[in-house]
């Protein structure tokens, strides 16, 4: 679907032409999983897949939302003075949430608007379709209402939508990667301080492949919040030994001197701490052009997520183990929260087709339904895009 078609559909649905167009990417996390809410480091990048929006301000206080991904929902109309979450509004709650959070922060959004959304991120695949929607609405509101929002503040508002409005206790990585992404670069983020560094991703001769299990995962209904609680309990136990504010401040050398009474909490903490160290090592490996070492760190990350953090499951393990068995694979791991969703692999360019065929066959044989495969391109963060046909 071209952007011109989006404009035509906007006019069909809302009766007037749109005035602005916006895009926010999805994201993958190359390494650093379940570290963001533990005060550690993550290493995500923005994708060229994402969420498109076209919009127009209104003269009244009504907000109208329409998504081509949920056409059966029709136009969702909301009064500007009633932005409380409603289950019947589904996806539109993320848009309502951003309006609500910005108003609460003191930004003036005194009239309504019409918004048409089209996402090309598979919903529920773990590529941050919800954070992409939050950020495309954020940049849209910033432009339409001349709010002049600092970009890192906008990232934080996106997280507030997730945490306080939707009720999912997520970290800040997804919104940060989507708001701050840069084409051709990964982004090393310290989730404790929000210090960040761009790292050029020179994967010449290799392709990033996203492997979707096609097993839906609902973050709010998964064991995600349970893992957060377990990490908080593990940190409280560890604070008897060192007064660190987060697991991300611990080193593995320090951790290995501690005896745990609860083996489950020990494993959860071991993952958070070791994964943080792997993420920093991965940045060094990329800087030094040691791609094989980077791939080995990806593999170790998946093993830790499987054994110590227990967030992979049969589908993700089947994909990743099949990927490891193929020639020309630097590394492979699950990405995102887990419990289904996606894995990623870095594969030699000339083996991409045979890789997808072989892994797809192994997966469908074991699981009983097919996986989906996408080649990923690293793109820029959330932004207004020009009003030209592409």
Swiss-Prot record:
Q: In which pathway does it act?
A: Carbohydrate metabolism; galactose metabolism
Its catalytic activity?
Answer: alpha-D-galactose + ATP = alpha-D-galactose 1-phosphate + ADP + H(+)
Q: Which UniProt keywords apply?
A: ATP-binding, Carbohydrate metabolism, Cytoplasm, Galactose metabolism, Kinase, Magnesium, Metal-binding, Nucleotide-binding, Transferase
Location of this chain's protein in the cell: Cytoplasm
The entry's cellular-component GO terms read: cytosol
Quick check: keyword Metal-binding in the entry?
yes
Q: Which Pfam families match?
A: GalKase_gal_bdg, GHMP_kinases_C, GHMP_kinases_N
What Gene Ontology terms for biological process does this UniProt record contain? Answer: galactose metabolic process
In which residues is substrate bound?
33-36, 224
Q: Where is this site: Transition state stabilizer?
A: 27
Q: Which InterPro entries match?
A: Galactokinase, Galactokinase_bac, Galactokinase_CS, GalKase_N, GHMP_kinase_C_dom, GHMP_kinase_C_sf, GHMP_kinase_N_dom, GHMP_knse_ATP-bd_CS
Residues binding ATP:
67, 124-130
Name the protein family.
Belongs to the GHMP kinase family. GalK subfamily.
According to UniProt, the name of this protein is: Galactokinase
- What gene, per UniProt, encodes this protein? galK
